[in-house]
Swiss-Prot record:
Its cofactor is Mn(2+). It comes from Bacillus subtilis (strain 168). This is Phosphoserine phosphatase RsbP. Residues 1-42 form the PAS domain. Disulfide bonds: none annotated. The gene is rsbP.
């Protein structure tokens, strides 16, 4: 590395395709308070906060491999003493001796407070200059010039911050639309009627669902809830979506579907145990011809089956959440029915925080209500619950009429 790059007023980092650090300039190593031998050869995760590790794994590296360049990505570094250092990253992908190398420039963003303090110092100096008549003219001129320069720097930083916020807002809005468009449409035929509701507590949600007609007589229904909220949870749900969509439409059993989702979650975090997320989920396969429901409930709130007589059966958890334990053996259960009935699946955002799911009573009190009317009653009840308990959580539920 040449001297100019080594001592540049910004950090420089060269990474392998797997994220290992090939080179780092003195400026970056000094910012992080490491020795060169403590950095070179290590994975980039050593200098990232946990959210930044997840962001890089699920967004930064895939996007860089796809686009071959990235501009003004905001993440937080972690110094040796644990201090978080906000930076903007510009990166390009290149080939060196047949291998992919990612060159990154890291620009620290922690100078704003320093600039504000310098402005206060400059103002005090100007006041002192006015009181000291013998130095007033010269010192006042210096102070005013300093103040002007610092104001311009602060305005530029504010401009950059505002642009970053606008860019982030646009990206989140696009991600929200993509997430919403991935949800399945209602199904209505002479065998079943399926409808759903989905509402994110923020721009992005950790809840996701899907339902599909597998063949002439079978239907697959799944609902998931990734721990946490916001971007990290939403990125994980979106990585699970194409996987369970393919498996369900291929007619894989509930046990095999859950096993593949569990394997996928473990593969996401195999190099970073601290960033690991788990996910509760329940998958049901309804066989109309056999009048049977096979399901696996992985740590999810129990689904409800209510038959025409009003009798309710809870489909309790049969296994721990996916992504929690390696080599987990999932257990399936079955429910046979002889008459028409109604299913309710939901995430914990629609549960009463002081009791069991109050929606069970609502279904029992309105056994003959069409699904559309029942959905409106549930939404009204949800609104009352939010107002009473000041709740703010992702909300998702599915209603199924089996005819």
């Amino acid at each position: 590395m040449d001297k100019q790059l080594n001592d540049a007023p910004c950090g420089f980092l060269a990474l392998s395709e797997e994220g290992s650090i090939i080179a780092a300039n003195r400026t970056l190593i000094k910012i992080l308070d490491y020795e060169p031998e403590q950095v070179i050869g290590q994975h980039m995760n050593m200098m990232l906060t946990i959210p930044a590790q997840l962001f890089c794994q699920l967004y930064f590296f895939p996007l860089l491999k796809l686009e071959h360049h990235i501009e003004e990505i905001y993440i937080s570094l972690k110094a040796r003493d644990g201090e978080e250092i906000p930076v903007l990253i510009n990166a390009i992908a290149r080939h060196d001796s047949g291998a992919s190398v990612f060159d990154c420039v890291l620009i620290p963003m922690r100078k704003r407070n320093e600039y504000e303090n310098e402005l206060l110092i400059a103002r005090n100096e100007a006041q002192e200059a006015l009181l000291a008549k013998q130095k007033a003219n010269a010192e006042l001129e210096i102070a005013l010039e300093t103040l002007k320069a610092k104001q311009e720097e602060l305005l530029e930083i504010n401009k950059q911050n505002q642009q970053f916020k606008l860019n982030t807002k646009r990206e989140l809005e696009l991600a929200r639309k993509i997430q919403k468009n991935s949800l399945t449409e209602p199904i209505v035929n002479d065998q079943v009627q399926i409808d759903s509701y989905y509402n994110a507590s923020s721009e992005l949600s950790g809840d996701l669902y899907g339902y599909y007609q597998i063949d002439e007589h079978r239907y697959g229904i799944i609902i998931l809830d990734v721990m946490g909220h916001g971007i990290s949870s939403a990125l994980i749900t979106m990585s699970l979506h194409p996987l369970f969509q393919r498996q369900i439409t291929q007619g894989l059993s509930p046990v095999k579907v859950m096993k593949e989702l569990d394997r996928h979650l473990h593969s996401l975090f195999q190099n970073d145990e601290e960033a690991r997320h788990y996910c509760t989920a329940i998958y049901l396969e309804i066989d109309i011809a056999r009048q049977r429901i096979d399901y696996v409930n992985a740590g999810h709130p129990p689904a409800l089956w209510q038959d025409d007589s009003g009798t309710q059966h809870l489909l309790h958890a049969t296994s721990p959440p996916i992504g929690m334990f390696e080599d987990l053996e999932f257990q399936s259960s079955s429910l046979s029915y002889t008459e028409d009935g109604r299913l309710l699946l939901y995430t914990d955002g629609v549960m009463d925080p002081t009791a069991s799911c109050y929606l069970f009573d609502l279904l029992k009190d309105h056994p003959d209500s069409p699904i559309a009317d029942l959905k409106e009653k549930i939404l009204t009840s949800l609104q009352h619950q939010k107002e009473a308990h000041h709740k703010s959580d992702d909300e998702c539920f599915i209603l199924v009429d089996v005819k």
